[in-house]
Swiss-Prot record:
Protein name per Swiss-Prot or TrEMBL: Kappa-theraphotoxin-Gr1b
Location of region: Involved in active face: 4-6
Subcellular location, record wording: Secreted
Gene Ontology CC terms, in alphabetical order: extracellular region
Species whose genome carries this gene: Grammostola rosea (Chilean rose tarantula)
Keyword presence, Secreted: yes
GO MF, one example: ion channel inhibitor activity
Amino acid sequence: ECRYLFGGCKTTADCCKHLGCKFRDKYCAWDFTFS
């Protein structure tokens, strides 16, 4: 199960598609991709 926007994360793999882990803040943020 992936983490949605602003969900807690340890790595980008924790986040849903088009989201990447912001390591400093430890949450998933949009990675600026669409496809």
